[in-house]
Amino acid sequence: MELKIDTHSHTYASGHAYSTLIENARSAKENGLAMFCTTDHAESMPGAPHYWFFANQRVLPRFLEGVAILRGVEANILNTEGEIDLPLSVDPNLDWAIASFHEPVFAPSNKEAHTQALLNVIQGGRIDALGHLGNPHFDFDFHAVLHCAKEHNVAIEINNSTLKGHSRVGSVERCYEIARVGKALGVYFTTGSDAHFCQDVGKLDLASELLDSVGIDSHRVITHSPSQFLDFLELRGRGPIDELASLRQ
């Protein structure tokens, strides 16, 4: 499947990534993207930036190297109440918000606790996608969470880095099963490289392979085209981004 948007990438601001935004944009261009989301870790992760970093993304240009930039965050799920580590005041300055479990922030617990946290973060209405759900340390009720995501128009991320099998070990088959459940329920899918070095931005080959293998319709993959992605943002209640209107053509 052709994928034109990468919705999960990091700069050195995350504390354990190694490239600048401009370097990421250059790689995005080289890898054929139309746009990408910059989504550094929110402040509860060791080494991550203060929330002012995210609030100030309004100063970023809408295009670098001819590639559109979406202003985003990878927020941490903090607890079973589904709270995330970003003040509400930052939300208007963002185009895209992922919520993910990370072991240094949310200690792995049990299936019921993880499920409740995910349901609550979806229902909280602040996040657009759930990140790298395949991690076996954070088992959850696939059907309950994906059904809730479908009802609230929250996208399910297919994470290319996870599918390499080197991080979050044990995730790959779970990612395929999550995709199969999501297909049956009709959820929206997004795709992210989870790049921590610039050369990986836009490398979504394993995510594409999974989507094709499971038989996901491209109409349910919001990263298949810029117009689909921008339509999804508006479905989520985010205002139109005038500078990106030309990408709908």
From Swiss-Prot:
Name of a matching Pfam family: PHP
Q: Which Gene3D superfamilies match?
A: Metal-dependent hydrolases (3.20.20.140)
Q: Does the keyword Metal-binding apply?
A: yes
Tell me the cofactor note: Binds 3 Zn(2+) ions per subunit.
Q: Which UniProt keywords apply?
A: Hydrolase, Metal-binding, Zinc
Q: What InterPro entries does the entry give?
A: Phosphatase_YcdX_put, PHP_dom, PHP_phosphatase, Pol/His_phosphatase_N, Pol/histidinol_Pase-like
Instruction: Name the positions where Zn(2+) 2 binds.
Output: 16, 41, 196
Superkingdom field: Bacteria
Q: Which spans are transmembrane here?
A: none
Q: Which Enzyme Commission number(s) are on file for it?
A: 3.1.3.-
Residues noted as binding Zn(2+) 1 in the record, renumbered to the chain: 8, 10, 74, 194
Q: What family does this belong to?
A: Belongs to the PHP family.
Report the protein name in the record.
Probable phosphatase VVA0289
Query: Which species is this UniProt entry from?
Result: Vibrio vulnificus (strain YJ016)
